[in-house]
Amino acid sequence: MNFFPWLTIIVILPIFAGSIILFLPHRGNRVIRWYTICICILELLLTTYAFCYHFQLDDPLIQLVEDFKWIDFFDFHWRLGIDGLSIGPILLTGFITTLATLAAWPVTRDSRLFHFLMLAMYSGQIGLFASRDLLLFFIMWELELIPVYLLLSMWGGKKRLYSATKFILYTAGGSVFLLMGVLGVGLYGSTEPTLNFATLVNQSYPVALEIILYIGFFIAFAVKSPIIPLHTWLPDTHGEAHYSTCMLLAGILLKMGAYGLIRINMELLSHAHSIFSPWLVIVGTIQIIYAASTSLGQRNLKKRIAYSSVSHMGFILIGIGSINDTGLNGAILQIVSHGFIGAALFFLAGTSYDRIRLVYLDEMGGIAIPMPKIFTMFSSFSMASLALPGMSGFVAEFIVFFGIITSQKYLLISKLGITFVMAIGIILTPIYSLSMLRQMFYGYKLFNAPNSYVFDSGPRELFVSIAIFIPVIGIGMYPDFVLSLSVDKVEVLLSNFVYR
C-alpha cells in the first residue's frame, strides 16, 4: 500500500500556492499569469502521475486512501480517497481549470485576487470529488461559494451584483438542506456520530427518515446541477460572468451536483433512490424539452448556451434514474463530455464578445468570413452539443438512451414514452444550436456595427479551443477510455439495489 499523501498534496497545493500570489508585485500581471498557469500545470501533472502509477482500474474499492484525525469530538477526519466514480471529474477539473487560467489572460484588474480565487476554487472542487467524509464534503462544497461570488460581483457584466446575489442566495439556501442532511445521516443510529462514507454505505434507515434525508440532499444538489425549477440562477450567472469563470461553472461546478446525486443519494440512500428514480426520469425528460424550448427563445448568446446546459443535464438525471449499469455509465460519460463542450462554448462566446462587443443574437451576423477560426471551432462544438456521431455528446446520449430502454425497473410503455419525449428534445437541440450559428456568423449586420474590432482567433485562443476539442473527438471515437474508469464501480454500486 502506498502511504505517500498524494491526494492531500493535490487538494491543498492550489490554494496554498495561490495564497503566495497575494504577496507578488501589484503590477506584475504577467508574472501572476505565468505563476498561476504553472501551478495549474504542475497540479495536473501530479494528478495524472498519481492516478497512472497508483490507481488500479480493475479495483472498484476506494484507493489512495488517506485518513487523518482532525476533531475527536464527533469523529471528524480528513478522509480522502478515489474510485472509478471520482477519477473522471478530478481529471476534468484539472484540465478545464488549467485552460480557464489561460483563457483569463486578458484580465488585468485586480489580477492577484482573481487568480487566487480561481486556485481556491480548484482546491475546493478536487477536495469535494476526493472526500470520503460527509462533513469534509460539505466544507469543500461551501468552499466554492465565496470565490464564485467574488468572481461574479467583481469581474462580471453590468448586472453582476444582481446575478451574484441571486447565485449566493440559491446556493446558500441549498447548502442549508445539505448541512441538515449531513447532520441527519451522521447522527442517526449510533451513540457515536460517524461521517465516514465507508461506514455510512452499510447504514440502514427507517423508510420515512431515508426519504426525508433523500429529499434534503436532492434539493441541495438540484440547485447546483441545476434541476428545474431551481435553475433560474444559472442563465443570469452565465450571462454576467467573465468567460473564464463561465468555463469553471459549466465545466465543473454543475457537475458537482450530479456527482453528489450519485455519491450520496444513490450510494448512501439506495432504498429511497429506488423509490424516487421514476420521478428523476420524469423530471429529466421534462428538463430536456423545457430547457431546449426556452433556449430557442433567448436573445442573449450566453443565456442560450446556459439553457442548453440545463437541457443536457436532463440526460444525466435520466441515466441516474435508470438504475441500470448502462444508463449510469452514460450519465457519468455525459458529466465528462458536457464538461468539455459547455466550457468550450462559453469560452468561444466570450472571445467573440471581446471582439464585437455584442451579446444579443439579433444584433450579430456576418462574422464567419473575418473570423474563420472562431467560426470553425464554434461550429464544431455546436455539432458536439447536438450529439453529432463521432463526438462525445453522441456517445453519452446514446448510452443513456440504451440504458433507459434496457432498464428492468420500468414498463415497456413507460420506456417508449420516455424515449419518444427524449427524441423530441434531441430534435430541438439542433434547432437552437444551428439558429445560433446562423444568427452569429451569417448575414451582413456586423459590418454596419460601430466600435467592432473584427479579427480572428489568436494563438492562445486557438490553443485553448483545440485542447478541448481533442478529448471531445477522442471520447467520441473511443468512449471506453472514460467508461473503463467507472464500469467496475458502477457494477458494485448497483449491487445495492439487487440485494437490498
UniProtKB/Swiss-Prot annotation:
Source taxon at top rank: Eukaryota
Membrane topology: Multi-pass membrane protein
Keyword terms, alphabetized: Chloroplast, Membrane, NAD, NADP, Plastid, Plastoquinone, Quinone, Thylakoid, Translocase, Transmembrane, Transmembrane helix
GO molecular function: NADH dehydrogenase (ubiquinone) activity; ubiquinone binding
Catalytic activity: a plastoquinone + NADH + (n+1) H(+)(in) = a plastoquinol + NAD(+) + n H(+)(out); a plastoquinone + NADPH + (n+1) H(+)(in) = a plastoquinol + NADP(+) + n H(+)(out)
Enzyme class label: translocase
GO biological process: ATP synthesis coupled electron transport; electron transport coupled proton transport
EC number, UniProt record: 7.1.1.-
Gene (UniProt): ndhD
Organism of provenance: Daucus carota
Descriptive protein name: NAD(P)H-quinone oxidoreductase chain 4, chloroplastic
Chief location of this protein within or outside the cell: plastid
